[in-house]
């Protein structure tokens, strides 16, 4: 495919709302973090809207939490993520902010009028709860595993864009550990979330970076890639990606427990096995 923007993307370029002395402030409030996390924290503090695309296991959640409360000390904050990581978000928030109030929105409706602090909801519940969520003035929005939004035509994507556009949230983080730059079209919805200039028109983006062309039936094909090095430059101020190979300060191995709810019929099958 030619070049790739899947390496270390990010830098000092301001891409919307530079906060003063971001690096120095990041070092001051993050003494217990690994150096790459301090760098990521500084990156998030240096812009109001950004994409953090580190490999899984490099601590995107904690970087986002710290950056969010530093940029906007008063909540509430809304985290949209897959259902399987909602519990992990609560744990990470309480590690960083032991006194934080957290609310998980689950299948049983939660009284949205009482939302404060950190509210965690999964993508699948957005359709049910979006009207209630739009009643709040969120200090920050986090879209975790943001590759769930890679199809800009889905209802999930449209609801997410409504939250960004209609709540007036001053800080937006898009987090993903999945490299999207092998197929640039998957990046477009994330660029919309963070209000990047390249997120204004999909067809213009596709013609420039997706090798867009019409097939024999007159339909646009946008699954290719083109001008990748140029795209890398364009992303430099809005997206930061580090792979584990780039990061030299990690311990050899870390393990963590993740609680999951197992349906009763599955428990019975396991017990009978």
Please state what every model-predicted region is:
Residues 237, 241-273:
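Inter-lobe connector of SF1/SF2 helicase motors
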């Amino acid at each position: 495919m030619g070049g790739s923007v899947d390496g270390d993307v990010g830098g000092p370029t301001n891409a919307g709302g530079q906060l003063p002395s971001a690096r120095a402030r990041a070092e001051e409030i993050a003494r217990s973090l690994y150096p790459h996390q301090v760098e990521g924290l500084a990156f998030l503090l240096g812009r109001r809207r950004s994409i953090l695309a580190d490999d899984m296991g490099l601590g995107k959640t904690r970087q986002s939490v710290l950056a969010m409360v530093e940029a906007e000390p008063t909540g509430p904050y809304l985290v949209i993520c897959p259902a399987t990581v909602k519990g992990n978000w609560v744990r990470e928030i309480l590690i960083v902010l032991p006194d934080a109030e957290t609310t998980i929105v689950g299948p049983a409706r939660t009284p949205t009028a009482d939302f404060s602090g950190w509210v965690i909801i999964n993508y699948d519940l957005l359709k049910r709860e979006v009207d209630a969520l739009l009643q709040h003035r969120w200090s920050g929005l986090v879209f975790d595993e943001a590759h769930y939004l890679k199809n800009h035509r889905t209802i999930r994507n449209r609801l997410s864009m409504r939250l960004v556009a209609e709540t007036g949230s001053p800080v937006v983080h898009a987090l993903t550990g999945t490299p999207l730059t092998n197929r640039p079209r998957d990046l477009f919805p994330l660029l919309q979330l963070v209000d990047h200039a390249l997120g204004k028109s999909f067809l213009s983006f596709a013609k420039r970076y997706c090798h867009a062309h019409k097939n024999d039936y007159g339909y646009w094909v946008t699954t290719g890639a083109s001008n990748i090095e140029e795209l890398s430059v364009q992303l430099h101020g809005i997206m930061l990606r580090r792979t584990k190979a780039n990061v030299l300060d990690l311990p050899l191995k870390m393990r963590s427990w993740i609680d999951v709810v197992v349906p009763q019929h599955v428990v019975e099958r396991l017990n009978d096995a």
